[in-house]
Each structure stands twice: as C-alpha cells, then as structure tokens.
A protein has these predicted regions:
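Extreme N-terminal basic, low-complexity initiation segments
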Residues: 1-13, 20
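Active-site loop/lid in soluble adenylation, ligation, and acyl-transfer enzymes
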Residues: 63-124, 128, 132, 140, ...
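Targeting/processing segments of secretory and organellar proteins
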Residues: 26, 48-50, 58-62
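Catalytic beta-strand/loop module used to bind and position nucleotide/cofactor moieties
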Residues: 127, 151, 155-278, 301-308
Length: 308
C-alpha cells in the first residue's frame, strides 16, 4: 500500500510551526502565568517547532481544586501540545492536591503517530513514510504500542485521585475500573462492547479502543482512543506489525483487527460524559504546564528518539 491517494484530502503536511498564545488571550491559565519575549526555534529532526521562551510563576488566584470531576473539552493545534496536555493535567492535579479529577475529550484535526514510552521507533513505525508525508511521530509518557491518530478518532483522558481510589494503585485494577466505566457508558449505544486483552475495548472481536496509563504518587492518568469514523488505511501505511500483541488479535493485520464504532461523534461524546457522570466544565487549565512540557520534552528529538 503506497502513495497518498488512500488518505482524506488535505491530510498531508510537510512543515509545521506553532506559537503559543499570549497569557492575556483565551481562558485563564491554571496554576501559572507566562511572560513572553523573543521566539525560539527548536528542530525535532522531523519538523520545525516554533516556541516562545517564558518564565512561569504560581498564580494562586486561578487554582481550582475540588472533589468533583471537571471536564476539559480542548483540542490544541499541534500534536505535541495535545499529547503534552494530558500529562499537564496529571502534573497539575499532583501539584495542587486535586481530589475530583479531570475528564478531557479531544479529537485531532490532522494525522500523526503516537508511540508508547517504551516503544522502539524502528520496530513499530515506518519512519520513512512518516517523513515523506510530513506526519509527526511523538512519544507519550504512558506505555503501550504505537497508534495512528487522525480525524474520526476521539481521544479521552481521565486523571483520578489515588487517595479517592486507592485500589487503582494496582495496575490491573486501574485497567478494570476505567475500562468497565467506559464500557458501561457505551453499552446503551454499543451493546456488544467488551473488554479484551489488557487494555482494549472491542466489538465482536475487533478493537475500537486502545488505552494506557501512567501513575504518579497521588494521581493516575488513564487515556486512550475511541474510533468512531476514522479511515483505517493509514494504520498499515505508517505502522509495522506490533512486536507485542494481545492473544485475541490472532496475528491479524491492522485492517482486519481494528474497526470503527460507526456512530456519530455526538453519540460517542455523550456516552463518554455519561460514563463519568457529566462533569462540569473546567474554567481554567494548566496551559503553561503544557507549554513547558512541549518545550522540554515532547518537541525534542532526544525524547522521541530515545532507545527504550
């Protein structure tokens, strides 16, 4: 499978730059303020990322902590920002002692590849094709294998307090808790959905959701995907056969193993809200934590290309 014609129009991207907003723009930032000066350019080896230097300081007036879960419905422009923001929520909860947790829902507007913290780039990703097509490859802070992200794939992340849910310190219980919660929320519209493998949700034996986690001292980040209407051809185009496979996969190809929920986005979105009891919107978020993570980790070649 070669060439560009298999993909939706407009997916190809050769060079990418982005700049963060000034601190005075948009909603309040969560936990810090930012002072900007000259812009700097960082070369990840794949694409150029333009970032402003900043100095961060605590601003207690915008901290929000409670025992109620908060909803963050936010998609950023750059793939690095979106992957970093999940970790920023985890760090903010850990720093500020939040016990209610967060639910974040977002959807990519362009194609990129995400690899797990312990993934081997060469073994899991066709780097030549990604480079030719201008598709970024980003390493996340949680485990699991490589995935392709794009329009039609709804991402979610939950940050949960381990003080409120001490049993989630055990990884198997964390998987069971979050996946059973997700499945319960989706079952009214997808009766056949079930947990498969360690961290998948499947319908009639085909994967519709992959998930991974990361633990800190007092909080858990659990995040994953829900495919509802994503073209599946890019999976085989950009990914190699994974070195680790769940038993239920039975050596099937990406195309035969993965499927979509075939539901409208709004239906899947509402099912996610229902699963987590319709949390209230967060009025401020840890934007400068995210910016710092992008600058120091997610936009760097040393992080993405590290050898596990």
């Amino acid at each position: 499978m070669v060439g560009i014609g298999i993909f939706p129009e407009g997916f190809k991207r050769r060079k990418r730059t982005f700049t963060f907003r000034r601190a005075t723009e948009g909603p309040p930032r969560f936990g810090c303020t930012v002072e900007q000066s000259d812009r700097q350019t960082y070369d990840r080896g794949q694409s150029e990322v333009v970032l402003p230097p900043f100095r961060a300081s605590l601003d207690r007036s915008v901290l929000i902590t409670s025992r109620e879960m908060k909803l963050v419905d936010k998609t950023f422009t750059a793939a690095e920002e979106n992957i970093a923001f999940d970790e920023a929520l985890l760090l903010a909860a850990e720093r500020d002692g939040d016990e209610g947790g967060f639910l974040r829902i977002w959807e990519p507007t362009d194609w990129f590849v995400v690899i797990g913290r312990g993934s081997s780039l060469e073994n899991e990703v066709d780097l030549e094709r990604c480079s030719e097509d201008g598709v970024p490859v980003i390493r996340r802070s949680s485990g699991g294998a490589a995935i392709v992200a794009g329009p039609g794939c709804l991402f979610y992340a939950v940050v949960l307090s381990l003080k409120q849910y001490p049993a989630l310190r055990f990884i198997d219980r964390a998987h069971a808790h979050v996946l059973s919660t997700l499945a319960a929320g989706l079952r009214s519209v997808v009766p056949q959905i079930e947990r498969q493998g360690t961290s998948d949700l499947a319908v009639e034996g085909r994967k519709v959701s992959g998930n991974s986690l990361r633990c800190r001292k007092d909080h858990l980040l659990y995040h994953g995907t829900l495919l509802y209407d994503m073209p599946l051809e890019p999976l085989a185009h950009y990914l190699r056969s994974p070195p680790r496979q769940p038993e239920y996969r039975n050596q099937r190809s990406h195309r035969d193993f993965v499927t979509n929920l075939k539901l409208p986005r709004k239906v899947v979105y509402q099912a996610l809200l229902s699963a987590w009891d319709h949390p209230e919107h967060l009025r401020a978020w840890p934007q400068c934590d995210m910016e710092n993570l992008v600058r120091e980790k997610y936009a760097t070649h040393s992080w993405t290309a590290q050898i596990p």
